[in-house]
């Protein structure tokens, strides 16, 4: 369905409702761009491919699974996690009605705690099935553009994607020696207000003669995630 490519909300819902974590995800290793910073070593690392197409004759059918049962509200779920460890600092759930709902969690990796520490403490019985993405505590879980940037740029698939039963965890946090990552991690790029204004002006100029450009998935994807999130109080 080509129309999915111009409707980010439908596209993401389709992926979450379609994929089987055990048969639709392929991780490869090979040469990476020189600008990559997330792989353990320069110029070499992992890439991920996800098959969200319909199965055809001759292919093994996907296992039939029901939509995840959400037994806890977001506030209750956050407090449950914080009862396990206070380092779980914020939570945001998206598409709870999908077969594989999306759960974003911010974690505090200070005091020697690494990502694996939190992964081992995520209670899948409480979280049910779905996709769980871990972010650093300073990341605003309401900033859709930043969330997408981090999950695409802070991950090496062979290290940062963990499949556990009916769930999958993606570690989109910064990596350091505590995570076994020895390479320097680049600082955040900060733009001045002047640069932001200029970039927004260029975008306005780009779309003014082609209103349909705003229907591109690249522009439509971030707004689809705009739902409330919870943070520690």
Q: Where are the regions a protein language model picked out?
A:
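Charged, compositionally biased interaction regions
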Residues: 1-233
């Amino acid at each position: 369905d080509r129309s999915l490519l111009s409707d980010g909300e439908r596209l993401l819902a389709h992926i979450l409702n379609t994929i089987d974590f055990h048969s639709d995800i392929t991780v490869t290793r090979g040469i990476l761009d020189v600008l990559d910073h997330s792989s353990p070593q320069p110029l070499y690392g992992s890439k991920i491919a996800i098959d969200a197409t319909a199965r055809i004759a001759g292919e093994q059918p996907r296992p039939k699974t029901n939509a995840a049962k959400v037994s806890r509200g977001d506030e209750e779920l956050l407090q449950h996690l914080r009862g396990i460890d206070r380092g779980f600092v914020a939570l945001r759930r998206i598409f709870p009605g999908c077969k594989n709902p999306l759960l974003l969690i911010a974690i505090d990796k200070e005091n020697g705690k690494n990502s694996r520490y939190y992964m081992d403490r995520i209670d899948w019985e409480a979280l049910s099935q779905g996709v769980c993405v871990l972010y650093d505590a300073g990341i605003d879980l309401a900033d859709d553009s930043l969330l997408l940037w981090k999950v695409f740029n802070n991950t090496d698939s062979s290290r940062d994607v963990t499949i556990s039963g009916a769930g999958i965890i993606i570690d989109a946090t910064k990596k350091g020696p505590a995570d076994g990552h020895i390479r320097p991690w680049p600082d955040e790029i900060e733009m001045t207000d002047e640069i932001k204004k200029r970039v927004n002006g260029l975008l306005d100029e780009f779309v003014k003669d082609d209103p349909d450009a705003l229907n591109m998935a690249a522009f439509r994807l971030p707004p689809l995630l705009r739902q409330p999130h919870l943070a520690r109080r």
